């Protein structure tokens, strides 16, 4: 993900942190390092990269993979919304939304074996939900504070 400047990067990472929290993924988070350009600023525990375990049923394994996929989608969308907070005005998201969808659609097919309708529905629900979340003044305040530190 390319950022325009340091402020843009800070808001983007703040958005991803909020996305992780919304999807209750704090237990999967290892660290956030604003200076770690090489590894994408956010590191996860090995459990995030879970790819199956013979001791876990296939259904449980699929649900874990789906949860991580949904959280990743949420992080990307939250990044988008949070990066637009400093502008303080409504933003058109159509182009960015298409680009994110294209990326996550391929991943959803590959990792979760979801079909196009399932991916589209989940993506739109996530987008709509996060749009509401980032309209909340309390969330916006948290995002501003996180991005400033």
Task: Please report, for each region that a protein language model flagged, where it lies by residue.
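Soluble catalytic regions of large protease machineries
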Residues: 2-149
